[in-house]
Amino acid sequence: MAYPTLEKLFHVDRTSDRYENLQHLLQQRISSESTFRTGIYLDSGELFLAIPRELSVLHERVLRRERRVSALWKGLPTIALGAYIRSLILDEVVYSNEIEGVRSTRRDIEIALERARRDTSSLPGAAGKAHAPFAEFAQLYLNLTDNPQQPQSLQDIREIYDSVVRDALDKRDRLGEALFRTGQVVIANKQGRVLHTGVSPESKIEALLTQWIALSQSDSIPETYSALLCHFLFGYIHPFYDSNGRTGRYLLALQLSRPLSQPTVLSLSRTIAENKNVYYKAFDVTERPLNHAEGTHFVLTMLGLIGDAQESLISDLEEKQSSLDELEVAVKQCSNELSRRACDVLYFAAQMDIFNAFRETRLDDVAVWLGVSKPTSRKAFGELGAHDLIIKTSQRPPVFELTPKGRNLLGLM
């Protein structure tokens, strides 16, 4: 029998003592030597995590898959790594938005990032003209590659939230001088049933978020477990009027980037978007009064979603690695007809075709990679164009992609 919720055990108990029996079961779970108690009290009790066999097995499988992900990741060339991580980041932002019903596309996010890169006034805290929506949100995920510091204060959490919603939030939902919302929020479904009532007043929000920070930094609980419990707790607190989900999922990615690989972390929102009902039910089950704030089933569900994300990632990496192996052979066979530099550019463009979100190759990037001037790079692109292997798709900046002939020659059709 799978590890049952306390609520389920209560309902199968037909005796007149079922309330007393439920309290006995609760005490058994919460007082077990293997249980992690948080000391954080919610409306239905102290948030805690029991460690049943199922959870240990799921966690071990996640760690085992991480070894496979890391091995595949380390086998990729630098060009492919950079292109793939950016593609994952674009997807992560798009799918995190989608979960909340906010429409965006990969191209929207890419354009926002490019505008932000060109306009230094779009950096967090800088004054200046407005910039494209989602620029700072996407930049948060890009910065994960630099191992940013975890939130140390309530102000840090607010600043992360501001980056998530800047220029993408209705003015009516923006906060004033207070760090967090001062009014009440109630989440209901289409039928009007209340699904969740956010914590209030603001003083209680601040108190629970202070405990959230302590839990996120605790060295007395495995980091994966604390990250997942913190994800539930942030959703439970619901500290803002809007965009709590996107802020919470970024914070989850930030925390999981310590025990797990970046590719895994950046694949999670897509899996959540594909399993939204499972994801939201995990919150609902944990909040039910008869479950007395046990976080075990939430962690079990999230570990399952992480596992699904890993499986999809591994499959995609293996497929791309196979294409890369065939590509290297194909490029070598072109050396009789093309100059060495043209072959290098072709190899770069082919990697972008496999790993880049838009299959695009920028002349500026190639020049930097080759360590040559832009005119020298342009000459190599011209040689490939003369053989109908590559075509220019943008003048400013100069952007190219493989032609059907080029893709067919390299076995990428």
For the regions a language model picked out, list residue spans one by one.
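FIC/Doc superfamily catalytic core
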Residues: M1-M413
